[in-house]
UniProtKB/Swiss-Prot annotation:
Organism name: Staphylococcus carnosus (strain TM300)
Enzyme class: hydrolase
CC terms in the record's Gene Ontology section: cytosol
Name by which UniProt lists this protein: Pyrrolidone-carboxylate peptidase
GO molecular-function term, one example from the UniProt record: pyroglutamyl-peptidase activity
SUPFAM superfamilies in the cross-refs: Pyrrolidone carboxyl peptidase (pyroglutamate aminopeptidase) (SSF53182)
Record's keyword terms, sorted: Cytoplasm, Hydrolase, Protease, Thiol protease
Subcellular location, record wording: Cytoplasm
InterPro entries, per database record: Peptidase_C15, Peptidase_C15-like, Peptidase_C15-like_sf, PGP-I_bact-type, PGPEP1_Cys_AS, PGPEP1_Glu_AS
Active-site feature positions: E78, C141, H165
């Protein structure tokens, strides 16, 4: 499969984005998958426009966006993107939408059509902490996951799409003693495992990975 992997530039005052640093280290081939990497801006709509332009220019079987989730200690494949922008902080062009639908004619939510449970388990099997997440937030990460679902629903019915959040890396938490981090090499290992779990048949595993609350 041809898979497009995207990651955001640094945002929120950070000098680095672990998602971007991690995809730079991914190999160009993971199992049977040919990997293409794309940096996108942490900017509402402009980020998804850049992906849309790439999809117009080149065919891909799947798109996986990677983003930073400072405060999480594990890798978290996301189950669903919701149709709302509600930004607690401005994006990198000082946009701060509050309670604004991402697409007026879009569904309330789009579920990733990747085998997210299989991917989560593959990360764990590689020795990296992971959990299936049911919320991608309401900032640009959720925005991108939702926009990928919208693109699949309206333009590219055969494309697979998803999102994985990654923690801070250690250098980002030197002055944040209450925040967890993960070594960049571990993030890369986990992402490789997740991507490697994707197959042509797209079958997921039947296992309870949900949450009580």
């Amino acid at each position: 499969m041809k898979i497009l992997i995207t990651a955001f530039d640094p945002f929120g005052g950070e000098k680095k984005n672990p998602a971007l640093e991690a995809i730079k280290l991914l190999p160009e081939q993971i199992k049977n998958h040919q990997i293409t990497k794309l940096e996108i801006p942490t900017v509402f709509h402009k980020s998804s426009d850049k992906i849309a332009d790439k999809l117009k220019a080149e065919h891909f079987d799947a798109v996986i966006a990677i983003g930073q989730a400072g405060g999480r200690y594990n890798l978290t494949p996301e189950r669903v993107g919701i149709n709302i922008d509600d930004a607690r902080i401005p994006d990198n062009e000082n946009n701060q939408p509050i309670d604004i639908p991402i697409q007026q004619d879009g569904a309330p939510a789009y579920f990733s059509n990747l085998p997210v449970k299989k991917m989560t388990q593959a990360i764990k099997d590689a020795g990296i902490p992971a959990a299936l997440s049911n919320t991608a937030g309401t900032f640009v990460c959720n925005h991108i996951l939702y926009q990928l679902g919208y693109l699949q629903a309206t333009r590219y019915p055969d494309i697979k799409f998803g999102f994985i959040h990654v923690p801070f890396i250690p250098e980002q938490v030197v002055d944040k003693p209450d925040k967890p981090s993960m070594a960049l090499s571990s993030i890369v290992t986990g992402l490789e495992a997740a991507i490697g779990a994707i197959s042509e048949d797209n079958q997921d595993i039947k296992e309870a990975l949900g949450e009580i609350q």
